[in-house]
Structure formats: structure tokens, C-alpha cells
């Protein structure tokens, strides 16, 4: 997602060629939780465990994929996440997505905030409905999704919080703070993209 957002829908060879032909420096915002930086999204909650099963499938380790799928399915409705997005917006949910502006379809990449989505899927039927909406790009309109723009998120749980930043699992314990970083890193892009 990040390469496409930075360089467009081109091969890496074309992205490199156009960047070297007319280089420009772009400040890229991101997020931080603990010592971990991210530039695409942080996914908080047990449904993020499906990413580990997907990776096992990609590696063609079917036994591991089945085991990780079973863990993900069992934990999906057992792990509740308490969240605080602002003084006006807090609650409990199964999954919270914290999306950086550069990949959000609803925000300009120059916005100085995250797009946070609390996604409440209490049962498999609601999960299937949300997955169907997501397939058609309409997940933000689903009644089980609450959206907000924010620069800071706090999450808590009575269990170890499954938290993934840019697709990688990080250990955060039972509480985590996620903060927006306006100028997290400088990247080189083709001049026309800036």
C-alpha cells in the first residue's frame, strides 16, 4: 500500500527510474506505539490475528495456517478492546483500525491526523456483512463502524492486546498508546508526486 501511495501504480523499476530522474523530498507522517513506527495502519484486536494465518498460507504452511486460523477465530469474539479516541469518543470494540492519511481513501495525505475506525462485530453474521461491505469498498458506511479523525488513541484490554503495525505484530501488553507523528520520516519521491 505504501509504495503505491508514494509512487503510483507502477513497477518498482519505473518508480525508481522516475524518482532518480526528478527526485524530491517529501515529509511523511506516521504513527508510533512504544518504539514502533508505522506509516500505513495499526490494527488493534483479535481479528488482526488473521494476518498471521494469511502469511502462513502465503508461505504454503497449511498446518500452521489452520492452527493460526483456529486461534484467530477463538480469540475474535473473546478479546474486547476498550478504546479512547477523544474525550467525546470512547467505548469497547472487537477491532480498532488506525489509518495513516497517506493510505486513507477519505483523507488527504497532508492531513495531520489518523483516521480511526472502531469496528464492532459481535458475531459471525455481522462479520460476514462487514466483509461483504468491505469487498465493495463500503465498509465505512456499515452501521457497525464508528469513524473519527484523531492524533492520539489509547487502547486497553483484560488480555494481551493483539496489535499489528504495517502488518507486523508488536507486543504491547494490556495497554497501548498510539500517537500521530506529523514528520515521521523523509522519503524520496518523483517531483510530480509531491
What are the residue ranges of the model-derived segments?
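Short linear motifs in intrinsically disordered
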Residues: 16-24, 68-77, 104-106, 143-145, ...
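ATP/nucleoside-binding phosphotransfer catalytic cores, i.e., glycine-rich phosphate-binding loops
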Residues: 111, 118-194
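Active-site beta-loop-alpha substructure in enzyme catalytic cores
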Residues: 90-126
Amino acid at each position: 500500500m505504501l509504495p503505491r501511495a508514494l509512487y503510483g501504480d507502477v513497477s518498482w523499476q519505473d518508480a525508481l527510474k522516475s524518482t532518480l530522474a526528478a527526485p524530491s523530498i517529501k515529509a511523511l507522517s506516521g504513527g508510533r506505539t512504544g518504539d514502533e513506527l508505522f506509516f500505513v495502519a495499526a490494527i488493534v484486536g483479535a481479528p488482526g490475528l488473521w494476518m498471521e494465518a494469511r502469511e502462513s498460507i502465503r508461505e504454503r504452511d497449511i498446518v500452521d495456517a489452520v492452527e493460526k486460523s483456529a486461534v484467530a477465530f477463538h480469540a475474535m469474539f473473546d478479546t474486547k478492546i476498550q478504546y479512547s479516541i477523544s474525550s467525546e469518543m470512547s467505548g469497547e470494540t472487537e477491532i480498532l483500525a488506525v489509518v495513516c492519511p497517506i493510505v486513507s481513501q477519505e483523507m488527504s495525505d497532508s492531513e495531520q491526523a489518523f483516521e480511526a475506525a472502531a469496528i464492532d462485530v459481535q458475531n459471525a453474521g455481522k462479520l460476514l456483512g462487514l466483509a461483504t461491505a468491505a469487498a465493495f469498498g463500503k465498509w465505512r458506511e456499515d452501521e457497525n463502524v464508528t469513524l473519527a479523525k484523531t492524533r492520539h488513541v489509547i487502547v486497553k484490554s483484560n488480555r494481551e492486546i493483539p496489535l499489528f503495525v504495517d502488518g507486523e505484530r508488536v507486543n504491547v501488553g494490556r495497554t497501548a498508546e498510539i500517537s500521530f507523528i506529523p514528520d515521521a520520516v523523509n522519503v524520496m519521491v518523483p517531483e510530480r508526486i509531491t
